[in-house]
Structure formats: structure tokens, C-alpha cells
Amino acid sequence: MKVVIFIFALLATICAAFAYVPLPNVPQPGRRPFPTFPGQGPFNPKIKWPQGY
């Protein structure tokens, strides 16, 4: 009987893991997302080539 309960609990855990849907990450109003590409925002300046070439 313990084996049957263990298998049932294992299957229930697997089904719960597949059924889990994470909540969408909604940015808070008034806050801009952190820039990720060069040239966007004050913390991520554009990459400049050296002036000697």
C-alpha cells in the first residue's frame, strides 16, 4: 500500500510541475526597464572605436 501511495504522490508531483505556469513579469508603472542593448539609457553607453584608427 505504501508503494501505491508513493507512486501516486510521484505522479501528482510530476503533473503539478507540468501544470505550473509562471506569472508574467509586469514592470512597475513609472519605472523604465534596465537597458540591455548598447546605446540605450545612461548606464549603457554606445561602444566607440579608438580615435587613432
Swiss-Prot record:
It comes from the Eukaryota. It comes from Apis mellifera (Honeybee). The keyword Nucleus does not apply. GO terms for biological process: defense response to bacterium; hemolymph coagulation. Keywords: Antibiotic, Antimicrobial, Immunity, Innate immunity, Secreted, Signal. It is found in: Secreted. This peptide has bactericidal activity. Residues 1-19 form the signal peptide. InterPro entries: Abaecin_antimicrobial_peptide. The keyword Signal applies. One of its GO terms (cellular component) is extracellular region. This is Abaecin.
